[in-house]
Amino acid sequence: GYIDTSIQLSDKYRPWYSSRFANIEEVADYWMKNYNTLKEKTELFTDAFYATTLPAEVVEAVAANLTILKSPTIFRQYDGRMWNWEGCGNEYGSCYGSCTHVWNYAQAIPHLFPKMERTLRETEFFVSQAKNGHQAFRSALPIRPIRHNFHAAADGQLGGIMKVYRDWHIYGNDEWLKLIYSYVQNSLDYCINTWDPKRKGVIEEPHHNTYDIEFWGPSGMINSYYTGALQAFVAMGEHLEKDMTEYRELLDKSIDYMENQLYDGEYFIQNIRWKELQASDPTKVQSVNSNYSKEGLDLLEKEGPKYQYGKGCLSDGVVGAWLSLVCGLDEAIDRKKILSHLLSVHKYNLKRNLRKHVNPQRSTFALGDEGGLLLCSWPKGGKLQLPFVYSNEVWTGIEYQVASHLMFEGEVEKGLDIVRTCRDRYDGRVRNPFNEYEC
């Protein structure tokens, strides 16, 4: 029932309200008849929200960003299923398809409107997933099966498995878990067969991700997602009394590799690897930017494929461990090492003033006398000549992710420090407090 076979390629999107109201007069009539109830519910939420004891900067940040739910970034088609842009302009949407790795960072909807959030999982696993487990990380609108002619996104697909665990816990319905379980297993098996074919517990084959490139070789960022996905799947499978021996062995290997091969003593890094893999030469594989000039070929031999981060300190270098926490999973990776990574990010990547920071990318996100959390830095040297393309930028989504993770680990003041730095940029004088744009 999740694939509407009546939808044709030529069909246009029909919004949810069109299934409830024939015209604006019916909307107005409903509003008038239910005004008192709607007002009471609105005031109840508002009063409860602002009764919080959270610090003012956190309340402001959450309140401002919750308004996105009432913007054209969020669509809901006629049957109630949700579909989202990454953001929106005055007359257009920005980056279509409820992008799985982008929406990993959004945690409001599953707690405010859990039924709507579950429709995202149902689209990802029932509609946008092929029989071999490949998941298209951008879904079609109207929601319908989509062509599978590009990479799956490792962070989006693995993150989706953790979010199934979260949504099941919020819902509390085992029947929903039983319905989606085989699709989740198919998805995870695809991830293993495609990116960890040697069953090392490591994502090492080239894998697409939120930076719009492919990482080659294991990284703290993606392997933390892998660890979390395995942990979530083992927990769901054991609840359903399945034999999880194979997946638990992979989970143990994944944790061991994270802690002993990707941790440099201070933070988690990437081991760039492009030889002795199942994937072909980096110049030949499908990629957004796979063209190599003569200079690029020289760099390939010297540093490896373009657009990696190597020995850098990546701000979301343990983002999978953060997602595990917010999804309700226990900490699997050594907490002291995770905290050390986060403290390193705060130490090296948080800049109070960006006037001397060179950013050849999208510099308007944060510039001049503003502060911000850089996506990556190389405090110990080893910066690649062609690092991943957004490395010098500042993204609010990652600022909040790192800040909240620091708070989870007990470093509340350092987390608030990042939040304040972010919100200082969006104080209404130069930037719109309701528009922390990234795309």
Q: What are the language-model segments listed below?
A:
Residues Q8-F21, E122-E124, H239-K242, E246-Y247, ...:
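Composition- and surface-driven signal marking solvent-exposed, interaction-prone regions
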Residues W31, Y35, K39-T42, T46, ...:
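Short amphipathic alpha-helical coiled-coil/interface segments
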Residues S219-M244, L251-I255, S391-R429:
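Extended amphipathic alpha-helical segments enriched in small hydrophobics
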Residues L9-Y17, F45-A61, W176-I180, G201-I203, ...:
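Short, glycine/acidic-rich hinge or "gate" loops at secondary-structure transitions
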Residues G1-C99, W103, M116-E117, D174, ...:
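Acidic/polar, glycine-enriched structural segments that form the non-catalytic walls/loops
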Residues H169-V184, Q385-V389, E393-G397, A403-V412, ...:
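Hydrophobic alpha-helical bundle architecture
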Residues V58-E91, K115-H148, T194-P218, E259-V394, ...:
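Extended glycan-interaction surfaces of carbohydrate-active proteins
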Residues I24-L38, R81, Y92-P206, I213-E238, ...:
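Aromatic-rich carbohydrate-recognition surfaces in CAZymes
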